[in-house]
Design a protein with these regions (language model features):
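Proteins that catalyze or organize thiol-disulfide redox chemistry
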Residues: 1-161
Length: 161
């Protein structure tokens, strides 16, 4: 805002130009203040993967398992566009899903074994395990996918009553 005033609203500027530059600078300052005081979004309700917990929940509850890593740009893209906290809260509410995040930033033999068991070797991968006997055949979304593709995969689950 100060730079704008120095460039376009200085002593030599016309009255109309000073008014426009001042209004624009004020708008920028107010917008910056408003943006900075917005509350942080509630984080997504992910649980950290533990093989024993996963095995105990399988077949008993519907699960959505996300395989990710800090070094994976495609994973980060999905987190920012498809797997947003707002969408994940709505999904868990609608389907009663438990969300489990498998972090492969560091080697984890049990997590990598699960990744191979669903037929994948690379990430990102999201696997949806229905409740009951169908959990033996998870719905798998590989690489990049859209929110509508995720919704289509979830549509095979029964909404929570």
């Amino acid at each position: 805002a100060a730079w704008m005033w120095g460039q376009w609203g200085g002593l030599r500027a016309s009255g109309r130009q000073k008014l426009f530059t001042g209004a624009l600078a004020l708008l920028m300052v107010c917008g910056s203040i408003w943006w900075s005081v917005q509350p942080a979004p509630e984080p997504a309700p992910w649980e950290t993967f533990r093989a024993d917990t996963f095995r105990s929940l399988l077949k008993k509850e519907p699960l959505m398992v996300e395989f990710t890593a800090d070094w994976c740009p495609s994973c980060k893209f999905l987190e920012q566009t498809v797997l947003t906290p707002k969408r994940l809260h709505a999904i868990t509410e609608r389907y009663g899903l438990r969300l489990i995040k498998v972090d492969l930033t560091r080697p984890d033999p049990e997590a990598q074994a699960l990744l191979r068991a669903i037929g994948s070797v690379s990430i990102p991968v999201t696997a949806i395990f229905p409740k009951g006997l169908l959990s033996n055949s998870p719905i798998v979304l590989r690489d990049l996918y859209t929110a509508s593709q995720l919704e289509d995969a979830l549509a095979t689950l029964s909404p929570r009553k």
